[in-house]
């Protein structure tokens, strides 16, 4: 029986084992629609496995994973989950470096188009407006004709977030966006993700505590595949168990 929930994402009692190692161990997590949530934890805590689980790359051995209270993600494949409205941005940008920002955005337009057919076809007015709005939202409106390979690392991350937005996701899964960014890019990225929350549910997996602090959102600490603590960053940072296993003090 599917639990009654209006949450964007609902994970209950999820466990995943690889060759006897429990990557997730009775993990339970719930995110409200439009929420921004940071997920932190030491290496091997289960953060990446959790994202793999939500996107259908990994199947749970036990547990429930619901999207919008009605879609059982454990029964769907990666394409079906993406089409429902769950988008993932990996740590390393996948921007095509030989084409422009505009053309990268065009490739990402949702709809039944093959990638290179998208590039060649004439955009309608609605498409152009949407792409311009997204470029402006991610701070790339002045770089729209710039070749992808000439962008800074931070700009590539923003472009990839823009490409995800064009797919109209309900949930954005963002994996370590601050890695390799300058301080100013890091703060701008935090501002962007705060702005996206509300319109989208945003999960950010991150190691940079200054970046997490800038997000100003609820924090979930994972350890050994389950939730160790939740709350504001100041709250979890003062938790003795978190200090012991994560902060190393």
Model-derived regions: residue spans:
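Conserved ABC ATPase "signature" region
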Residues: 118-143, 191
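The feature captures the beta-strand-to-loop junction immediately N-terminal to the Walker
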Residues: 40-42
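ABC ATPase NBD Q-loop/coupling interface
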Residues: 64-84
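Catalytic Walker B motif of ABC-type/P-loop ATPase nucleotide-binding domains
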Residues: 172-176
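Helix-to-loop junction immediately C-terminal to a conserved catalytic motif
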Residues: 55
């Amino acid at each position: 029986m599917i639990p009654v929930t209006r949450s964007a994402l609902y994970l209950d009692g999820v466990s995943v084992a690889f060759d006897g190692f429990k990557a997730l161990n009775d993990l339970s997590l719930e995110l409200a629609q439009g929420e921004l949530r940071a997920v932190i934890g030491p290496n091997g805590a289960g953060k990446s496995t959790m994202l793999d689980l939500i996107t259908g790359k990994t199947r749970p051995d036990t547990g429930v994973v619901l999207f919008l209270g009605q879609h059982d993600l454990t029964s769907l494949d990666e394409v079906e989950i993406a089409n429902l409205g769950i988008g993932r941005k990996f740590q390393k940008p996948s921007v095509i470096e030989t084409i422009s920002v505009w053309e990268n955005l065009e490739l990402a337009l949702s709809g039944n188009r093959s990638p290179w057919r998208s590039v060649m076809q004439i955009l309608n007015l609605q498409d152009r407006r949407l792409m311009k709005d997204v470029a402006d939202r991610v701070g790339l409106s002045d770089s729209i004709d710039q070749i992808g390979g000439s962008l800074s690392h931070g700009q590539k991350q923003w472009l990839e977030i823009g490409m995800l937005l064009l797919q109209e996701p309900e949930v954005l899964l963002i994996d370590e966006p601050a890695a390799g960014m300058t301080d100013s890019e890091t703060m701008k990225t935090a501002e962007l993700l705060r702005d996206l929350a509300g319109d989208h549910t945003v999960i950010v997996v991150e190691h940079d505590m200054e970046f997490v602090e800038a997000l100003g959102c609820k924090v979930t600490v994972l350890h050994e595949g389950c939730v160790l603590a939740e709350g504001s960053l100041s709250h979890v940072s003062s938790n003795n168990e978190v200090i012991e296993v994560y902060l190393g003090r």
